[in-house]
Amino acid sequence: MPILSKASYLFTTFITVASLNIQAQNPSENLPVPLNEAQITARFAELALECVHKEYPNIIKHMMRSDDDVQTPKLLYPAFYGCFDWHSSVHGHWLLSRIAHMHPETVHFERIINSLDKSFSEANLAGELAYFERSDTGTSFERPYGLAWFLQLTSELREWDHPKAKEWLAILHPLENKIIANISDWLPKLSFPIRGGEHSQTAFAFGLMLDFSEAANNRSFKALVETTVLRLYENDINCPLAYEPSGQDF
């Protein structure tokens, strides 16, 4: 390290330590009181509970071939219409499942159970599956980000020892199978990785897919994802870190 840089580092460290010491000796009455874990967990639960069944505002990706195809988000996606878009709704439901699983003592536990029960009805998931079976948009819909988060959701339900989790997982299972089939059909056709810092980035999605393959003990899907990861990334060298960050990163 150059002398100037080292000196600057030592000076910055000294100022930081001194500032902390002054604050310790003269605590300000205006400093916010840190939230504890239960309060933070409750706040995250509240954010998800407020949005999973809030239909608008909303942005949808939906191909329309005629006036008959014009539909509201709730009609298009009966289970995952809230939280502004499909994938945000999915990981909002994952968040609720995760909180109820890991923190059953949360004050919002019953609200979470009721909210998930409202979303994960057989009728709602039949509607979701019908959308994925559309030949025009269903095969590429929410690929890969939303699909990976859906698999993370079902992974959470598998790991949660609660009667409702097992019930919901059974209802979600047909859509899970369809999503696995769509991904499995797509991966061999993917010639290059998607490296941008947005939802389409493949490395992040592959990580969630591998998590799912472990939770579901789906060896064939795991092998396919691992083969794809090696094919697309194994020979990567000299990653241009100087190009980061990008103005389009999410």
Task: Label every PLM stretch briefly.
Residues 1-10:
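Bacterial N-terminal signal peptides that target proteins for export
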Residues 9-19:
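Bacterial N-terminal signal peptides
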Residues 22-24:
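Boundary at the C-terminal end of the N-terminal hydrophobic targeting segment
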Residues 26-81:
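Low-complexity, Ser/Thr/Pro/Gly-enriched N-terminal "stalk/linker" regions
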Residues 50, 54, 98-101, 156-159, ...:
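Positions within ordered alpha-helical repeat solenoids
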Residues 75-78, 82, 90, 97-209:
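Extended ligand-binding groove/face enriched in aromatic
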Residues 87:
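Metallocofactor- and cofactor-centric catalytic cores in central/energy metabolism, strongly enriched
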Residues 179-249:
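Loop-centered beta-sheet repeat module
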